[in-house]
Amino acid sequence: MQEFDVAGVGRFPTVRMRRNRHHRWTREMVAEQHLTVKDFIWPVFVHGGPEREVSVPSMPGVVRYSLDAVVDAVGHAVELGIPAIAIFPATDPSKKTTLAEEALNPDNLVCQALRSLKQAFGNDVGLLADVALDPYSSHGQDGIVRDGYVLNDETLEILLSLIHISEPTRLSW
Protein backbone atom coordinates (compact mmCIF):
# COMPACT_ATOMS: atom_id res chain seq x y z
CA MET A 1 0.00 0.00 0.00
CA GLN A 2 1.38 3.38 -0.95
CA GLU A 3 1.88 5.90 1.83
CA PHE A 4 1.76 9.64 1.40
CA ASP A 5 2.33 12.64 3.65
CA VAL A 6 -0.65 14.53 4.96
CA ALA A 7 0.25 17.91 6.42
CA GLY A 8 0.17 17.80 10.21
CA VAL A 9 -0.97 14.16 10.28
CA GLY A 10 1.95 12.05 9.23
CA ARG A 11 2.19 9.04 6.99
CA PHE A 12 -1.26 7.94 5.77
CA PRO A 13 -2.56 5.18 5.91
CA THR A 14 0.00 3.90 8.44
CA VAL A 15 -0.91 6.73 10.80
CA ARG A 16 -4.62 7.44 10.85
CA MET A 17 -5.54 10.24 13.18
CA ARG A 18 -8.98 10.30 14.73
CA ARG A 19 -10.80 12.46 17.17
CA ASN A 20 -10.15 11.47 20.78
CA ARG A 21 -13.33 10.04 22.34
CA HIS A 22 -11.94 9.52 25.82
CA HIS A 23 -14.14 12.16 27.47
CA ARG A 24 -17.95 12.13 27.58
CA TRP A 25 -18.26 15.63 26.07
CA THR A 26 -16.27 14.61 22.96
CA ARG A 27 -18.25 11.41 22.53
CA GLU A 28 -21.49 13.38 22.74
CA MET A 29 -20.17 16.00 20.33
CA VAL A 30 -19.39 13.45 17.61
CA ALA A 31 -22.21 11.01 18.26
CA GLU A 32 -24.18 10.15 15.15
CA GLN A 33 -27.50 9.74 16.90
CA HIS A 34 -29.15 11.88 19.53
CA LEU A 35 -32.28 10.11 20.68
CA THR A 36 -34.88 12.00 22.65
CA VAL A 37 -38.35 11.14 23.86
CA LYS A 38 -39.67 12.59 20.59
CA ASP A 39 -37.99 9.73 18.68
CA PHE A 40 -39.95 6.96 20.39
CA ILE A 41 -43.16 5.08 19.67
CA TRP A 42 -44.66 3.52 22.78
CA PRO A 43 -46.12 0.03 22.28
CA VAL A 44 -49.43 -0.15 24.16
CA PHE A 45 -51.10 -3.48 24.82
CA VAL A 46 -54.87 -3.59 25.32
CA HIS A 47 -57.17 -6.29 26.68
CA GLY A 48 -60.92 -6.64 26.91
CA GLY A 49 -61.20 -7.62 30.56
CA PRO A 50 -62.46 -5.61 33.53
CA GLU A 51 -59.04 -5.10 35.21
CA ARG A 52 -57.55 -1.70 34.34
CA GLU A 53 -54.03 -3.13 34.20
CA VAL A 54 -52.85 -6.71 33.80
CA SER A 55 -49.15 -7.58 34.06
CA VAL A 56 -47.51 -9.37 31.14
CA PRO A 57 -45.47 -12.14 32.79
CA SER A 58 -43.13 -12.56 29.82
CA MET A 59 -42.29 -8.82 29.83
CA PRO A 60 -41.57 -7.57 33.37
CA GLY A 61 -42.78 -4.01 33.90
CA VAL A 62 -45.17 -4.14 30.92
CA VAL A 63 -48.93 -4.16 31.37
CA ARG A 64 -52.00 -4.61 29.22
CA TYR A 65 -54.52 -1.80 29.64
CA SER A 66 -58.28 -2.16 29.61
CA LEU A 67 -60.19 -0.08 27.11
CA ASP A 68 -61.22 2.38 29.84
CA ALA A 69 -57.64 2.70 31.17
CA VAL A 70 -55.80 3.10 27.87
CA VAL A 71 -56.84 6.76 27.46
CA ASP A 72 -55.35 7.67 30.86
CA ALA A 73 -52.15 5.75 30.13
CA VAL A 74 -51.69 7.41 26.75
CA GLY A 75 -52.51 10.79 28.30
CA HIS A 76 -49.56 10.33 30.65
CA ALA A 77 -47.33 9.39 27.71
CA VAL A 78 -48.42 12.53 25.84
CA GLU A 79 -47.55 14.63 28.92
CA LEU A 80 -44.07 13.07 28.87
CA GLY A 81 -43.65 14.09 25.22
CA ILE A 82 -44.02 10.68 23.57
CA PRO A 83 -45.33 11.56 20.10
CA ALA A 84 -46.84 8.26 18.96
CA ILE A 85 -48.20 4.98 20.21
CA ALA A 86 -48.72 1.59 18.60
CA ILE A 87 -51.69 -0.49 19.74
CA PHE A 88 -51.40 -4.27 20.11
CA PRO A 89 -54.37 -6.39 21.19
CA ALA A 90 -54.50 -9.29 23.63
CA THR A 91 -57.44 -10.97 21.96
CA ASP A 92 -59.62 -13.27 24.04
CA PRO A 93 -58.74 -16.85 23.02
CA SER A 94 -62.44 -17.60 22.46
CA LYS A 95 -62.41 -15.04 19.61
CA LYS A 96 -59.39 -16.53 17.84
CA THR A 97 -60.08 -18.68 14.78
CA THR A 98 -58.09 -20.31 12.00
CA LEU A 99 -59.26 -17.56 9.62
CA ALA A 100 -58.71 -14.73 12.15
CA GLU A 101 -62.22 -13.33 11.63
CA GLU A 102 -61.98 -11.09 14.71
CA ALA A 103 -59.40 -9.01 12.84
CA LEU A 104 -62.21 -7.80 10.55
CA ASN A 105 -64.61 -6.95 13.37
CA PRO A 106 -64.95 -3.14 13.42
CA ASP A 107 -65.43 -3.42 17.19
CA ASN A 108 -62.32 -5.48 17.91
CA LEU A 109 -59.97 -4.28 20.65
CA VAL A 110 -57.71 -2.30 18.32
CA CYS A 111 -60.58 -0.45 16.64
CA GLN A 112 -62.23 0.36 19.97
CA ALA A 113 -58.98 1.61 21.48
CA LEU A 114 -58.12 3.70 18.44
CA ARG A 115 -61.56 5.33 18.36
CA SER A 116 -61.29 6.23 22.06
CA LEU A 117 -57.78 7.60 21.64
CA LYS A 118 -58.65 9.59 18.52
CA GLN A 119 -61.61 11.12 20.34
CA ALA A 120 -59.47 11.96 23.39
CA PHE A 121 -56.35 13.28 21.65
CA GLY A 122 -57.26 14.13 18.07
CA ASN A 123 -54.02 14.60 16.18
CA ASP A 124 -51.92 15.37 19.28
CA VAL A 125 -50.56 11.83 19.30
CA GLY A 126 -49.70 9.56 16.40
CA LEU A 127 -51.80 6.40 16.37
CA LEU A 128 -50.35 3.26 14.83
CA ALA A 129 -51.65 -0.28 14.61
CA ASP A 130 -50.01 -3.47 13.47
CA VAL A 131 -51.66 -4.81 10.33
CA ALA A 132 -51.35 -8.44 11.30
CA LEU A 133 -53.43 -11.54 11.82
CA ASP A 134 -51.42 -13.30 14.54
CA PRO A 135 -53.33 -11.62 17.42
CA TYR A 136 -56.55 -13.05 15.99
CA SER A 137 -55.52 -16.47 14.68
CA SER A 138 -55.88 -19.62 16.75
CA HIS A 139 -52.64 -21.02 15.33
CA GLY A 140 -50.58 -17.87 16.00
CA GLN A 141 -49.46 -17.46 12.39
CA ASP A 142 -49.61 -14.04 10.76
CA GLY A 143 -51.46 -15.48 7.79
CA ILE A 144 -54.10 -17.90 6.65
CA VAL A 145 -52.76 -21.45 6.85
CA ARG A 146 -53.97 -24.46 4.90
CA ASP A 147 -52.26 -27.85 4.94
CA GLY A 148 -49.27 -26.36 6.76
CA TYR A 149 -48.66 -23.54 4.26
CA VAL A 150 -49.35 -19.82 4.59
CA LEU A 151 -51.63 -18.72 1.76
CA ASN A 152 -50.12 -15.38 0.80
CA ASP A 153 -52.78 -14.16 -1.63
CA GLU A 154 -55.67 -14.96 0.72
CA THR A 155 -53.76 -13.40 3.60
CA LEU A 156 -53.13 -10.19 1.65
CA GLU A 157 -56.85 -9.85 0.88
CA ILE A 158 -57.67 -10.06 4.57
CA LEU A 159 -54.88 -7.65 5.50
CA LEU A 160 -56.23 -5.11 2.99
CA SER A 161 -59.68 -5.45 4.55
CA LEU A 162 -58.10 -4.96 7.97
CA ILE A 163 -56.62 -1.67 6.79
CA HIS A 164 -60.01 -0.54 5.51
CA ILE A 165 -61.84 -1.21 8.78
CA SER A 166 -59.20 0.89 10.59
CA GLU A 167 -59.61 3.80 8.15
CA PRO A 168 -62.42 5.56 10.07
CA THR A 169 -59.97 6.09 12.96
CA ARG A 170 -57.68 7.98 10.55
CA LEU A 171 -54.53 6.31 11.76
CA SER A 172 -51.31 8.27 11.51
CA TRP A 173 -49.64 5.76 9.22
Name each model-derived stretch.
Residues 98-129:
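Alpha-helix-loop-beta-strand connector modules within alpha/beta enzyme cores
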Residues 35-62, 128-150:
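N-terminal small/glycine-rich loop or linker at the start of catalytic domains
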Residues 107-115, 148-160:
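Acidic, His- and aromatic-enriched active-site or binding-groove loops in soluble protein domains
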